[in-house]
A protein has these predicted regions:
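Extracytoplasmic/periplasmic substrate-recognition and gating elements
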Residues: 59-61, 141-142, 164-165, 241, ...
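Extracytoplasmic/periplasmic solute-binding protein
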Residues: 133-148, 153, 177-236, 255, ...
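Hinge/lid segment of periplasmic solute-binding proteins
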Residues: 93-152, 194-197, 215-217, 226, ...
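Glycine-centered hinge/linker elements that transmit conformational signals in sensory
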Residues: 180-181, 228-267, 313
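Short, small-residue-biased leader/transition segments that mark boundaries at the very start
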Residues: 1-6, 462
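Extracytoplasmic "Venus flytrap"/periplasmic binding protein-like
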Residues: 50-129, 160-171, 275-277, 284-285, ...
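Short, well-ordered beta-strand elements
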Residues: 26-37, 58-63, 87
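C-terminal capping/gating helix-and-loop segments adjacent to ligand/active sites or protein-protein/ligand interfaces
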Residues: 389-455
Length: 462
């Protein structure tokens, strides 16, 4: 079976070391597989050039796959065939899959290495929530990833209508409902309903999986965890009664407010994202990715143009803030060639270094992953839209919506949560999405049955 195939020695690098580059190039080749698009790959090429200049014994071969699922499936097949890249971009669910194949190298032995490792001071520079996601794969907290491109969710709102009626931007879900009830009494709402009967709400949530997990945790429940034997369990779906009850309370609440026409998800608008509905006036608040700010820009609306505001994800209780962190990490595979594996580690260490992380934060829509980058003069000027004149003086600029999103997103970092990852946890996300869709849009589906169905489906995958 697949397990037996997996157990074979994994040989890193599709090209055997030493014969990849011909006689004129005896550098050791590091293969890095990723799923970044063209614009991000350009930045990656710059990071690679820096690395090769500093490490003349190594060369990096960047191999791009169109999307994250293709990347995951290609690596899984490669592992089964006894080959793998030296290093790759990974989501937590991918990491747990590769661990089934015993193909990943723990980063702890390299981090703790006296020569090529990473000091405690250096490790402390990483934003805690991002750094913690590297150790969610077993009860021992073994590190299999370091953060690379990171984003979160935010609330975007129509700042013009908020200003017109003097509404405070809601920080809690109770306040969201207050705004929603006030909104339903406005002429704007009446006009929107006339134009889009049955498809107007105060707030739309993009990701139904994120909605389920985030609300479950805001209500004080645990979504998934490891049991006493280190096996992954689905607390909120059915494994732990106390967690199930709290999670169901969150979904029952969302359902009630949905029925009142206050809040919905992207499915209500017939789309995967609420951004078009938001720009069309079908909702005045939307929760979506911090990396997708430009899609929610009211200045790009086809009808009445408006200013988009950015704020934190609403909470049930501000004392127990819970916000998802999104995006990928970077991981190292076990190699039969020790020099290649060391090179892979050095490459990953370079990718998350101050210089590389600063470049990534300045040139992409993703967050700084480190405090020293966040607090740097370059990043602070970038985020404020300031221009540096030829004489070195700073000219105050105008902050873009994308920059506002980066700033507001990281301001929530104390609320970032991570969920443990194990074989089957990615399927749990799919089932979480299904629960929300069934409860809100399914024909006569009860909350209890939606949970039972999801739990039974999840157990098949363990």
């Amino acid at each position: 079976g697949l397990g037996d195939v997996y157990k074979r020695q994994v040989i890193c690098g599709v090209v055997a070391t030493g014969c990849g580059g011909g006689n004129d190039d005896d550098r050791i080749e590091i293969e890095y597989w990723h799923a970044n698009g063209a614009a991000l790959t350009t930045v990656l090429e710059e990071i690679k050039a820096d690395f090769e200049a500093k490490n003349p014994d190594y060369k990096v071969k960047l191999v791009s796959y169109g999307d994250y699922n293709t990347l995951r499936d290609t690596i899984t097949s490669a592992i089964a065939g006894g080959i793998a890249p030296t290093a790759a971009q990974t989501y937590p669910d991918h990491i747990s899959l590769y661990l089934e194949g015993e193909a990943l190298q723990s980063l702890d032995k390299y981090i703790n290495d006296p020569v090529n490792g990473m000091s405690k001071e250096e490790q402390a520079q990483f934003i805690e929530g991002f750094w913690a996601e590297g150790t969610i794969y077993d009860t021992a907290g073994t590190r299999y990833g370091m953060p690379f491109n990171k984003s979160t969710e935010l609330m975007y709102y129509n700042a013009d209508i908020f200003a017109k009626y003097g509404w405070e931007v809601p920080k809690t879900w109770d306040e969201v409902i207050e705004v929603a009830e006030a909104y339903k009494k406005t002429t704007e709402y009446a006009e929107a309903i006339k134009a889009n009967p049955g498809k107007v709400y105060a707030l739309g949530y993009d990701s139904e999986a994120n909605l389920f997990i985030t609300l479950t945790q805001q209500y004080g429940a645990v979504y998934t965890s490891f049991d006493a034997n280190g096996k992954g369990i689905y607390n909120a779906f059915g494994a732990v009664e106390a967690d199930v009850l709290k999670s169901k309370a969150s979904m029952n609440w969302y359902l009630e407010e949905f029925k009142k026409g206050n809040i919905a998800t992207s499915t209500a608008f017939g789309t995967d994202y609420c951004s078009d509905a938001f720009k069309a006036g079908q909702c005045i608040m939307t929760i979506g990715s911090s990396a997708g700010a430009t899609y929610n820009d009211g200045q790009a609306a086809t009808g009445v143009k408006f200013t988009t505001g950015v704020s934190a994800v609403p909470q049930k209780d501000l004392e127990n803030g819970q916000v998802i962190q999104q995006g990928t990490n970077v991981s190292l595979f076990k190699c039969s060639d020790a020099k290649e594996e060391l090179g892979g580690w050095l490459w990953l260490k370079h990718m998350v270094s101050y210089e590389s992380a600063l470049k990534w934060a300045l040139e992409t829509s993703y967050f700084p992953i480190r405090y020293d980058v966040l607090n740097s003069e370059e990043y602070q000027n970038h985020i404020k839209g300031n221009i540096i004149a030829d004489d070195g003086s700073v000219v105050e600029g105008i902050q873009t919506l994308a920059a506002k999103a980066k700033e507001a997103g990281l301001a929530q970092s104390q609320w970032f949560y991570t969920n443990v990852a194990f074989p089957g946890s990615s399927k749990a996300r799919d089932n979480a999405e299904t629960i929300v869709q069934q409860i809100l849009y399914g024909d006569s589906m009860t909350v209890d049955k939606a949970y039972t169905d999801a739990y039974n489906l999840s157990l098949i995958h363990i």
